Amino acid sequence: MNLSKSILLLFLATPVLAQENSQEFQYRVEMSGTVSTGTYAPLWLTANRFGMESEKPKSGYLRAGLEWHKPLRKGWRIDAGLDLAGGVKQTSDFWIQQAYADFSWKMLTLSVGSKERMGFPLEKNSELTSGWMAEGPNMRPIPQIRGEIKDYLSIPGTRQWLAFKGHLAYGIFTDGHWQEDFCGVNQKYAKKVMYHSKSLMFRLGNKEKLPVEFEFGLFMATQFSGDQYQKLADGSSKQITDMPDGLKSYWHAFFPTAGGSDTPEGEQVNVEGNMLGSWNFGLNFYAGDWKIRATLDHYFEDHSQMFWEYGRWKDGQLGIEVYLPKNKWVSAVLWEGISTKDSSGPILYDGFWGSFSDLQMSGGDDYYNHYIYQAWQHYGQGIGNPLLAGPVYNQDGSICFKSNRMKAQHVGISGNPSEEWKWRLIASYARHWGRYSSPLDKVRKQFNGMAEVTYLPQWAKGWSVSAALGIDRGNYLGNSTGGMITLRKTGGLGK
């Protein structure tokens, strides 16, 4: 609770700068319940909801949050929030979903704490997309200290033809105790793991002069430091690996570098920690009230797929978004094709572990998995695209992605018939091959679909209710049919 106390103090703190008179408190109270058949709830009733929804067929939660917004003089601003939640059949009975303070000057922000952040820096339709390949909204927020320019900032002298945005963050994974409880006998888990991410994205174009924009950039993230344990038959654990946690490790995370003699051999010939990322590209075309956007989200692990070392890129997510002029029927349409099947090929050979010391083959990337940190996950949910089901779905207590070689098609469509009503439909079809090291017994297929309607009554300002129907059919996660109802109340507490 120390973090929440710190946030409360920030509410009461008086900045050195002279203040404006206006300030605003906003509250949010929300409750949600899910009931379904099958072993698991339908995927799209769970995924991309910041870890708030459980994979279990019957679950629910209640959350309450308060935000404070304070504009100051000379372009300064403070935003802070505290969001608490409790649930039934969740990974925790009670948890702090958000506790943060943002200090902003013009377009530059220093954010401290745990905060729900949409995928960055590549923008996608958050209501319709299947997710982001490297990091998205599929898991609970990771507490961090983060400097960022969230929106594109024009570079002086370019007449607004060139702009950039980006971020730099260090944080800590808070799911160590969850991993220990979830982990099965003889399985491995990690605690006290640190987090690092950074991004830089450019936009070329000025839509006021030419109706075309091109975006390109890079996102990188790393798990580093921490300790690895193995669960024993008597319920105790033994430490297997003690990763370094000094200042040098923070530098190695920022600038991917081979580890020293205090790291396992695998880190000494590759890079220290679990380094991953994505190349991001976007192409926008504007025609009157129409907008067409194409995106490419290319995922990589270490260096093998970062460039064209093993041929042209075969893995990633290709997307097309179409935004229609305002009408009563359809607002947006989306299609995405996703592939993680190649993974740089099946061969991983580190010469120091074999007979040919001068031979190095860096294939078999084993996406989202790692031999020290187990998996790119937080509280059991994958940090990347949720069509690759996270460790929370593993009934044997293993913290890994059992199928990270997949091909999928995903579609979405949404509409806003009026100010009171909105709806969306999303559907995915995926084929799973398992892992190179442990392939599935056969190619397994899975369909995941969801229809959701939200009502925002004008006669009850601040209230909304959402009803969703989810349907899963297949032989990977199995069959499931279920519904979810979410009731929400938001409002202000004065200025």
For each predicted feature, which ranges?
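Extracytoplasmic loops and strand-loop junctions of Gram-negative outer membrane beta-barrel proteins
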Residues: T46-F50, D83, E127-G131, D181-N186, ...
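Internal, well-ordered domain-core segments that constitute the primary functional module
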Residues: M118-D234
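Short loop/turn motifs that connect adjacent beta-strands in outer-membrane beta-barrel proteins
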Residues: Q19-Q26, W68-D79, S104-M107, Y152-G166, ...
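Exposed, low-structure sequence patches enriched in small/polar residues
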Residues: V212-A221, D227-K495
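Bacterial Sec-dependent N-terminal signal peptides
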Residues: M1-E24, L493-K495
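One-face residue pattern on beta-strands with alternating periodicity enriched for small/polar residues
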Residues: Y61-E67, G81-D83, Y100-D102, T109-G113, ...
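Beta-barrel outer-membrane channel/assembly domains of diderm bacteria
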Residues: A18-R117, E127, E135, P141-Y152, ...
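Sequence/structural signature of outer-membrane beta-barrel proteins
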Residues: S36-G38, D83-K89, K115-M133, S154, ...
